[in-house]
Design a protein with these regions (language model features):
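Divalent-cation
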Residues: 1-165
Length: 165
């Protein structure tokens, strides 16, 4: 299975759905666009940007449970695309495989520094040319999310325009 990396988290310009872009790291560099929920998009963007909350969210909690059990996430495998839904599994260091939503699996991979691979068959069907993907970014790993959070921390009502009356 070819390895991919999270290229960006954002909003699909055509559908306004939150998406994660998985980019093939070798070969044609195809992009797999995975629709995700708002919470998973924010968690993925924060992980991509290296932003940590004061208290652990669900994904950090799962990582802590794995560590406490003496296990390590080795890789995330996106193995199937069925009825427009991507299916993934978490591969642990002891050979255990755990069924997972792809959105949760990607966030865990980002937080726990695990590889992400996508089945050739999935890439063949869902992989698109990078030049055809238009996404408004939430996070690209370039510090955008952290800069936005800093702005929100210091923003006052005067920083915003009055709403039209």
């Amino acid at each position: 299975m070819p390895q991919v990396r999270v290229k960006a988290v954002g909003t699909d310009a055509a559908t306004t759905s939150r998406v994660v872009l998985l980019e093939e790291t070798s070969g044609a560099g195809r992009i797999v666009v995975v629709a995700v929920g708002e919470a998973e998009a924010l968690a993925a963007a924060a992980a991509l940007e290296g932003v940590q909350s004061a208290r652990p969210g669900t994904h950090r909690l799962i990582g802590a449970v794995l560590r406490a059990a003496g296990r390590r996430l080795v890789r995330v495998r996106v193995h199937t695309l069925r009825d427009a839904v991507f299916h993934a599994e978490l591969d642990l260091d002891d050979g255990t495989r755990i069924d997972s939503r792809t959105s949760d699996a990607v966030v865990l991979a980002l937080l726990l520094d695990a590889d992400i691979v996508v089945a050739d068959a999935v890439l063949t069907v869902a992989g698109v040319d990078p030049s055809t993907v238009v996404v408004e970014g939430l996070g690209t790993g370039s510090g955008e999310l952290e800069a936005f959070r800093r702005f929100l921390d210091t923003a006052t009502p005067d920083d915003f325009d009055e709403p039209p009356r």
